[in-house]
Amino acid sequence: MSEGLFKKLEEVQRKLAERIVERPLEVSKIKTVGAVDVSYRDERARAAFVLCSFPDCELLKQRVVEVDVSFPYIPTFFFLRETRPVLIALGKERPDVLLVEGHGRAHPRGYGLASHIGLVLGIPTIGISKRLLRGTPEGSWVKVGKAYVSVGHLIDLPSAVEVVKTLNKNGYPLPLRIADRLSRGHTSWSGGVNDEH
């Protein structure tokens, strides 16, 4: 990628970040939580979406899709690579909250995949990651178990943390653990809540 294009993409990202809304979400009114994760093999993406009840986390739906990848891997621009597979996996589903395996506001420019998906769909999203990016601003995340939690869109950090704590099993939110297994090639989820990640 040329430096000129890199700078333009950074500027687009910063402008999109200004459109992110952080506000409290009434967690007691949440009925469904979705989760999405994407894995790669060669130049194909395998995206998994699961829908669970909240707060008891009963698996309601699962969907796995495989698509060609049209954008290269570029650190901090993951949203350009993963948005299409994620949206195809979601289809018409619109959970009350969506957990995204990727960053939200916990991003050097305050706009990761979770923020982009939330902005595109107009639904509350939470970014979940196992590690932080270099240059991530302090105060943009909270660690819950093994997960770095950040605002995606239409939720604030305390509400996001409450949702993730409710779903936390063995250090990571159960819906994302299920989506992770499906995206990596498992045909279905047969584990209980204590199944290892």
From Swiss-Prot:
* Cysteines joined through disulfide linkages: none
**Entry EC number(s):** 3.1.21.7
Would I find Magnesium among this entry's keywords? yes
This protein's UniProt keywords: Cytoplasm, DNA damage, DNA repair, Endonuclease, Hydrolase, Magnesium, Metal-binding, Nuclease
GO cellular component, alphabetical, reads:
cytoplasm
Q: Which cofactor does it need?
A: Mg(2+)
- The name under which this protein is listed is Endonuclease V
Q: What is the lineage of its organism?
A: Archaea, Methanobacteriati, Methanobacteriota, Thermococci, Thermococcales
Task: Tell me the name of the encoding gene.
Answer: nfi
